[in-house]
C-alpha cells in the first residue's frame, strides 16, 4: 500500500544494515506505523512488535495485522442465513467478503465526499474514487459497522474486515 512515508521499499535494506552493524534484538517498536509495513516485516521474522500511529486507519491495520495472531472464524456471523456458504473450501473470511461484495451499492460518506457525482457541486469535483466504487465502499463499511453494533463480530474480526476494506479501497483509488 503506497502512503506518504511508507518504508516498504527500504525495509530489507534497513534489516541488512542492522545485521551488518551487529545490532541484535527480538523486539521492535514501530513509532509511526502507518500502513504497518515495518511491523509486518519484523513480525514475520518472529520479533515481538509494538506499534503506534495517530491515524485511525493505521490503528485498524495494527489490530488486524500486528495484534491479531489467529485466523478469524466469524462463528457468530456465519451461521446466519444472510451469509450463505460458497464452497466447502472457502475460508470463513472469504465467505464473509464474498457476501459483502454482493451487497447492493448505496450512497454514503465516501460517495458524497470523494466521488465525481457526490461532489458535482464543487468547482472541481473530487475524483478519489469512481462513483460505483465510492458506493461499494460505503455499503461494505456500513454493513461491517452494523455487524459490530449487533455483536456479531468477535475479537479482531471487526478490524480484519476494516483492514480488508482499506486495502482493497486503496487499489481502487481513481479507478474509473
Q: What do the predicted segments below correspond to?
A:
Residues 126, 132-165, 169-170:
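Coupling/switch/interface segments within P-loop NTPase motor domains and analogous charged loops
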Residues 24-25, 158:
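A general structural motif
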Residues 1-23:
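S-adenosyl-L-methionine
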Amino acid at each position: 500500500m503506497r502512503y506518504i512515508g511508507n518504508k516498504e521499499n527500504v525495509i530489507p535494506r534497513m534489516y541488512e544494515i542492522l545485521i551488518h552493524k551487529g545490532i541484535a534484538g527480538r523486539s521492535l517498536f514501530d513509532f509511526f506505523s502507518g500502513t504497518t509495513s515495518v511491523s509486518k516485516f519484523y513480525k514475520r521474522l518472529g520479533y515481538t512488535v509494538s506499534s503506534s500511529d495517530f491515524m485511525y486507519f493505521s490503528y485498524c491495520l495494527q489490530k488486524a495485522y500486528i495484534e491479531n495472531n489467529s485466523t478469524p472464524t466469524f462463528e457468530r456471523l456465519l451461521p446466519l442465513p444472510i451469509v450463505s456458504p460458497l464452497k466447502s473450501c472457502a475460508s470463513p473470511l472469504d465467505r464473509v467478503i464474498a457476501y459483502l461484495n454482493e451487497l447492493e451499492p448505496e450512497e454514503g460518506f465516501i460517495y458524497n465526499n470523494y466521488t465525481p457525482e457526490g461532489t458535482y457541486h464543487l468547482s472541481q469535483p473530487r475524483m478519489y474514487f469512481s462513483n460505483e466504487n465510492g458506493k461499494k465502499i460505503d455499503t461494505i463499511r456500513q454493513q461491517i459497522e452494523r455487524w459490530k453494533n449487533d455483536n456479531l463480530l468477535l475479537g479482531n474480526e471487526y478490524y480484519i474486515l476494516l483492514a480488508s476494506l482499506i486495502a482493497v479501497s486503496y487499489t481502487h483509488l481513481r479507478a474509473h
